Amino acid sequence: MSQTAYLHVEHFLSPAETSSFGALVDEHAGLLREIAGRGGLGPRYRVIDGDQIRAMLPSVEGLGRERVRPLVERFAGEPLGAFGSPRRAQRVQIYSRPEQGFRWHRDGHPYVALVTIENGNAGQTQFLAPAWSRILRYLIYPLYPVPQLLSLLPRTAVTCGPGDLLIMRGQVAIHRGVTLAAIGRRILFVYAFDRDGHRPNPLRDLIARRLNY
C-alpha cells in the first residue's frame, strides 16, 4: 500500500454549518434505525440510509455530491462515481454506546469519506500499519470473528472533531471505528465512492448486506 491510506481535513465545515447539520439530524431522528450487527459480526450503530437521505435530506446528499466528492476525486487522482448500492452509498451513522462501532475490516468500495458532525464520545477511526494491511488483505475475513487478534498489531488512530473530513482508501487499508467514552455521541455523514463505471462485486455486496442492512 504505497499510497497514503487516508487524508484528514480539519474544519472542512464551518461551525455554523456543522451546527445546522446536527440540528437537521435531530429533526429527522424518527428515521434512525438501530443496526445490531447480524450474528454478532456486523457493525453496530443507528443509521439513516441512502434512500431516506435522497427522499428527506437533500442537503446531506448535496454536501456529498458538491463538496465531498471533488476532494475525494483529488485524493484518488481519478474520476469517481457513487457506490453502486444506493442504500449504502450515503448514510448518517450515529454511535452513542461503547459497544457501537465497526470491527476491523476492508470496504467493498475503494474510497469512503466521513464528515464528522459531532464527536462527544471520543470516537476514533483506527488503521492497521500499512505493512499489516498488505499481509492480511486476504486473511481479514477468516479472522473477522476474532478481532482481538488484529487489535494486537500496530495501528494509527485518527480522532476527528466536529466539521472535519476523513477520506480513506477503505478497500486496501484495514480499519475500524471505535467508541471510547461511555457518554456522548458521534454523528457521521458517510459517502462511499467507486471508480467511475465500476459495478460492485455481487458476492461482496451480498455479504455486506447480510452483515449490515
Residue ranges and their predicted role:
Residues 13-15, 118-120, 132, 171-174, ...:
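Short, solvent-exposed loop/turn segments at secondary-structure junctions
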Residues 1-75:
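Non-heme Fe(II)/2-oxoglutarate
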Residues 173-182:
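Short beta-strand His + acidic residue motifs that chelate non-heme Fe in jelly-roll/DSBH
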Residues 41-54, 65-125:
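Conserved double-stranded beta-helix
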Residues 115, 167, 183-198:
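A short hydrophobic beta-strand segment most commonly corresponding to one strand
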Residues 1-3, 135-137, 148, 208-213:
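Fe(II)/2-oxoglutarate
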Residues 94-165, 202:
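Catalytic core of non-heme Fe(II) oxygenases with the double-stranded beta-helix
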